[in-house]
C-alpha cells in the first residue's frame, strides 16, 4: 500500500459491511515483477512451512487487477471464524495526505474500539487514492459485496465489516473484484500454502513474498502453545511514521481490544517504525493485528491497565514476543528494498533517551551519501559523521550536549562475528586494514555502530534502525515508473 510503489488495498472488517477504500499504482516496464522467479539470494527468506494461529482462514485469488498476463493472486482475505470473540487493532500512516481508506479504517477502529473487527481484505496493483466520490462509492460497494458473499457462503454466519487502505490515481475495477469474491471465499483455508499465497497476493514490486510464523507460551499458561503469523509487503516508499507498509498479523492468544492496540502501537514503534528505504512515508500504509483467543478460549485475556504501575506478566511477555516478531517482518521489507544489495543495521549507543537515539539512527538511515557509499562498497565514515552532526538540528534534542565529538566513536561490525573495525575513535579517524575493509563490504549484511559515549561507562540507551543501500536499479525503477 505505498502510494508510488505498492498499489495494495487493505480492508478491516467486523460485523456488518462498512466502508472500504483502496490503492493504485501504474506500472509499465516493471509490470513483470508479479510473476518473476524469486531471486536465488532471497529464497532463504521464504518459509516452506509454518505454524499458524487457530481459528483464522486465509484466501487469495486473481481477479485480473494485475496487468494482463500475470497469474499471481491480487485479492486477499484474512478473517477469524465468527465463533471466536475477535478484536482488531491498527497503526496507520501519519502522512498529512492520508488515503480515504486510512481515514475509514481509523474511523472504524475508533467507533468499534477494536471489538468485533475480525479481519482484512486487500488487493494489490490498483489503488483508489484521489478518485473522489466515485472512488469512495467503489470502496463502499466492495465492502458491502464482500460481506454479502461471506455471509451467504459461510456455515458460521460470517457477516463482516470492511474498511481498506489504498493508493491513488485510478479507480478500482470494482466489477471484476465483486465477481471474484465467491472464488476468493472458496479458496480460503488454514494451510501453509494459503498463507504463502496471501503473502504473494499483496506483492507489487516485491521480489519475494514475506511471511513469518512462530509459537510461544505465556507465563500463566506454560503448557499451552499459542501461535502468531503475519504477512507483509513493501519495496519502496518506506520510512516509518506509524506504519510504513502493509502488514497483517494474527494470533490465537486471548487479548482484550485495549491491550491489543497498546501492544501493537508499542511494537510498531520498535519495528516497522525503525525501517527506512528511501525516506518517504507513504500516504496509505497500515499494519493491522487480530486476536481471537482460539488457543485458550476459557482463559482470561491479556488486559491493559492504563493506571497500573506495571502490567501483568502475560502482557510483558507478549509485548516482547510481538516486538521481536514484528521486527523480523519489518526487516524482510528492508531486505527487499527496491534494487537493494545491502541490508544495513544502524545501532546507536550511549543516547540519553531511546527517542533521542532512535532519531539519530533514523537520520543516518536516510543519508543518501552514506547509503550510496555502502552500495559502492566504500565505508567512508564521513557520511555517517555528517549525518550524525546535523541529526539533532532544529529538534527538541538540539543544544543538550547529546553529541560530543571527543566521545563519539564509529565502527563497522562484520556479519561473521569477527572483531569490529573502528573507523572513528573518540572523534579521531583511525587507520584500518584495507583488506579487512574490502572483505567486510563484500558481505550482504553491514552493521554500523555509533557510540555517543565511548567512555567505558556503558551508560545510555541503545536504538536500532534498519535500512538498505541506494543503487542504480533503485533509480531505474523509480525513474522509469510511469514511462
UniProtKB/Swiss-Prot annotation:
What EC class is this? Answer: transferase
Keyword Acyltransferase present in the record's keywords: the answer is yes
The record describes its post-translational modification as: The alpha and beta chains are autoproteolytically processed from a single precursor protein within the mitochondrion.
Per the UniProt entry, the signal peptide is none
Which amino acids does the record list as binding substrate? Answer: 204, 233, 244, 338, 478
Its BP terms in the Gene Ontology are: L-arginine biosynthetic process; ornithine biosynthetic process
Q: Which compartments does it reside in?
A: Mitochondrion matrix
Q: What does this protein do?
A: Catalyzes two activities which are involved in the cyclic version of arginine biosynthesis: the synthesis of acetylglutamate from glutamate and acetyl-CoA, and of ornithine by transacetylation between acetylornithine and glutamate.
The record's comment on protein family reads: Belongs to the ArgJ family.
* NCBIfam families, per database record: ArgJ
Q: What is this protein called?
A: Arginine biosynthesis bifunctional protein ArgJ 2, mitochondrial
Amino acid at each position: 500500500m505505498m502510494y508510488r510503489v505498492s498499489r495494495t488495498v487493505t480492508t478491516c472488517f467486523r460485523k456488518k459491511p462498512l466502508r472500504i477504500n483502496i490503492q493504485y499504482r501504474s506500472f509499465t516496464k516493471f509490470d513483470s515483477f508479479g510473476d518473476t522467479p524469486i531471486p536465488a539470494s532471497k529464497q532463504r527468506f521464504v518459509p516452506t512451512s509454518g505454524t499458524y494461529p487457530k481459528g483464522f482462514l486465509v484466501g487469495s485469488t486473481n481477479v485480473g487487477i494485475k496487468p494482463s498476463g500475470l497469474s499471481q493472486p491480487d485479492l486477499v482475505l484474512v478473517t477469524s471464524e465468527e465463533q471466536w470473540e475477535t478484536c482488531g487493532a491498527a497503526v496507520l500512516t501519519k502522512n498529512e495526505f492520508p488515503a480515504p481508506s486510512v481515514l475509514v479504517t481509523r474511523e472504524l477502529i475508533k467507533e468499534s474500539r477494536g471489538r468485533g473487527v475480525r479481519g482484512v481484505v486487500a488487493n494489490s496493483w490498483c489503488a483508489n487514492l484521489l478518485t473522489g466520490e466515485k472512488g469512495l462509492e467503489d470502496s463502499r460497494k466492495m465492502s458491502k459485496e464482500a460481506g454479502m458473499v461471506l455471509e451467504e457462503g459461510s456455515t458460521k454466519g460470517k457477516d463482516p465489516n470492511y474498511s481498506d487502505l489504498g493508493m491513488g490515481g485510478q479507480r478500482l475495477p470494482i466489477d471484476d473484484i465483486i465477481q471474484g469474491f465467491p472464488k476468493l471465499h472458496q479458496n480460503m483455508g488454514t494451510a501453509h500454502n494459503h498463507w504463502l499465497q496471501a503473502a504473494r497476493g499483496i506483492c507489487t514490486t516485491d521480489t519475494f513474498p514475506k511471511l513469518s510464523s512462530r509459537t510461544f507460551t505465556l507465563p500463566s499458561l506454560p503448557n499451552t502453545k499459542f501461535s502468531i503469523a503475519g504477512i507483509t509487503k513493501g519495496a519502496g516508499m518506506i520510512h516509518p511514521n506509524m506504519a510504513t507498509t502493509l502488514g497483517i498479523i494474527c494470533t490465537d492468544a486471548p487479548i482484550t481490544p485495549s491491550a491489543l492496540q497498546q501492544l501493537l502501537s508499542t511494537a510498531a514503534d520498535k519495528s516497522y517504525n525503525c525501517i527506512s528505504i528511501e525516506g518517504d512515508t507513504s500516504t496509505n500504509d497500515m499494519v493491522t493485528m487480530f486476536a481471537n483467543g482460539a488457543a485458550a478460549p476459557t482463559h482470561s485475556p491479556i488486559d491493559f491497565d492504563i493506571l497500573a504501575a506495571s502490567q501483568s506478566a502475560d502482557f510483558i511477555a507478549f509485548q516482547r514476543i510481538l516486538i521481536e516478531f514484528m521486527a523480523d517482518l519489518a526487516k524482510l521489507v528492508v531486505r527487499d528494498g527496491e534494487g537493494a544489495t545491502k541490508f544495513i543495521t544502524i545501532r546507536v549507543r550511549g543516547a540519553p533517551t531511546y527517542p533521542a537515539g532512535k532519531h539519530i539512527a533514523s537520520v543516518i538511515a536516510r543519508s543518501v551519501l552514506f547509503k550510496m557509499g555502502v552500495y559502492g562498497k566504500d565505508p567512508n565514515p564521513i557520511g555517517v559523521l555528517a549525518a550524525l552532526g546535523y541529526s539533532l538540528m532544529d529538534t527538541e534534542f538540539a543544544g543538550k550536549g547529546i553529541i560530543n565529538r571527543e566521545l563519539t566513536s564509529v565502527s563497522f561490525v562484520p556479519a561473521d562475528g569477527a572483531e569490529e573495525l573502528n573507523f572513528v575513535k573518540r572523534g579521531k579517524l583511525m587507520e584500518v586494514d584495507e583488506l579487512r575493509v574490502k572483505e567486510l563490504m563484500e558481505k550482504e549484511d553491514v552493521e554500523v555502530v555509533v557510540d555517543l559515549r565511548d567512555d567505558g561507562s556503558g551508560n545510555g540507551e541503545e536504538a536500532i534502525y534498519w535500512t538498505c543501500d541506494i543503487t542504480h536499479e533503485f533509480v531505474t525503477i523509480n525513474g522509469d515508473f510511469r514511462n
